[in-house]
């Protein structure tokens, strides 16, 4: 009888532990800097605060492809993005904010490796906290199969 009670209590604990976190995957393709700042940088901070106020954790993954490669380069001035004046004007600050998302908020950044050559990018051109994956579809499928809510952020 004690074993049954223990199993029931452990099962309840596991169920509650699963309910203690929420998960979201952002499908990031936008090249619009204002949208990126509002829908990712500011939104993640606000959403994390919301869930923390409810004693829940929010797990965040951002899958990078399309027009969004530009935000994750070591130096956009040495890439095809060298003509994006808005990006170049604020990139030092932007780069710090994005790194803070990885370091402070434990945001996972996954980049589509298949699209990198189209943009003239190699692994050495990408900031160190971004993990390069074979393609964006794999990242999105994997996270959605793990129960992540899907949020597209495109143009």
Whereabouts are the PLM-identified features?
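Sec-dependent N-terminal signal peptides
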Residues: 4-13
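Acidic/histidine-rich, surface-exposed loop or edge segments in extracytoplasmic proteins
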Residues: 18-33, 76-81
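Structural recognition of the beta-strand scaffold that forms the well-ordered cores
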Residues: 23-27, 61-64, 108-111, 152
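N-terminal targeting signals for Sec/Tat export/insertion, comprising classic cleavable signal peptides
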Residues: 26-56
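Solvent-exposed coil/turn segments that connect beta secondary-structure elements
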Residues: 31, 65-68, 114-115
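Surface-exposed patches in mature extracellular/periplasmic domains of secreted proteins
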Residues: 51-62, 111-113
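Acidic helix-start/capping segments at beta-turn-to-alpha-helix junctions
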Residues: 58-73
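A cross-taxonomic marker for long C-terminal extensions/tails that follow the last structured domain
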Residues: 73-155
């Amino acid at each position: 009888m004690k074993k049954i009670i223990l199993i029931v209590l452990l099962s309840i604990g596991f169920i509650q532990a699963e309910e203690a976190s929420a998960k979201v995957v952002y499908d990031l393709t936008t090249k619009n800097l204002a949208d990126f700042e509002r829908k990712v940088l500011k939104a993640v901070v606000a959403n994390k605060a919301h869930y923390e106020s409810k004693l829940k954790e929010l797990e965040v993954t951002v899958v990078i492809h399309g027009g969004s490669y530009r935000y994750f380069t070591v130096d956009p001035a040495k890439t095809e993005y060298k003509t994006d004046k808005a990006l170049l004007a604020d990139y030092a600050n932007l780069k710090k904010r994005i790194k803070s998302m990885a370091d402070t908020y434990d945001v996972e950044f996954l980049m589509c490796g298949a699209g990198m050559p189209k943009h003239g990018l190699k692994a050495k051109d990408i900031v160190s906290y971004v993990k390069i994956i074979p393609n964006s579809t794999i990242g999105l499928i994997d996270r959605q199969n793990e129960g992540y809510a899907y949020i597209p952020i495109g143009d």
